[in-house]
């Protein structure tokens, strides 16, 4: 326990907040180049082949990023925009690729939550035809 004099002289050390996405270095997004595009299996109770990409960011750091949505057009040397945000059942994946930006195309035939997947607004006629399908 410090004395009052010690506190006056030195003060208390602030606890630094640890970043959840350190590779972005405080930026909201970073551009990167896909080094490798592959799949990965999730943690214990879940089972799937989640699509991931190893991305070399513009600051030289290499990260593993998740490719959200159904289907993608990414391959090696694709330029992508990466944002923070982990995937709970994939250990070590702390970043996501933004769909609909740079080389990552938006998700096809996406009707709901379109903004999250870079999907354009469907034509009025196309939406009416798809409404009956369930």
Swiss-Prot record:
Q: Which Pfam families match?
A: Ribosom_S12_S23
Could you tell me which InterPro entries the record lists for this protein? NA-bd_OB-fold, Ribosomal_uS12, Ribosomal_uS12_bac
List of residues that carry 3-methylthioaspartic acid: 89
Q: Does the keyword Ribosomal protein apply?
A: yes
One example GO MF annotation: rRNA binding
Region Disordered: start-end pairs: 1-30, 106-134
Biased composition, class Low complexity, residue ranges: 124-134
Question: Sorted alphabetically, which Gene3D superfamilies does this protein's record hold?
Answer: Nucleic acid-binding proteins
List, in alphabetical order, the GO biological process terms annotated in this UniProt record.
translation
Key words, A-Z: Methylation, Ribonucleoprotein, Ribosomal protein, RNA-binding, rRNA-binding, tRNA-binding
| Family from the record | Belongs to the universal ribosomal protein uS12 family.
Can you state the subunit structure given in the record? Answer: Part of the 30S ribosomal subunit. Contacts proteins S8 and S17. May interact with IF1 in the 30S initiation complex.
The protein's name: Small ribosomal subunit protein uS12
């Amino acid at each position: 326990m410090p004395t009052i004099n010690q506190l006056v002289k030195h003060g208390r050390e602030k606890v630094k907040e640890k970043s959840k996405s350190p590779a972005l270095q405080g930026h909201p997004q970073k551009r990167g180049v896909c080094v490798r595009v592959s799949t990965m299996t999730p943690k214990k109770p879940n089972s799937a082949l989640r699509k991931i990409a190893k991305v070399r960011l513009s600051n030289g750091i290499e990260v593993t990023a998740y490719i959200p949505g159904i289907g993608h057009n990414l391959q090696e040397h694709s330029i992508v925009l990466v944002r923070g945000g982990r995937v709970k059942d994939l250990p070590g994946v702390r970043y996501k690729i933004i769909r609909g930006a740079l080389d990552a195309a938006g998700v096809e035939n996406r009707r709901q939550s379109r903004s999250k997947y870079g999907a354009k607004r469907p034509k009025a006629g196309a939406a009416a035809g798809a409404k009956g399908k369930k």
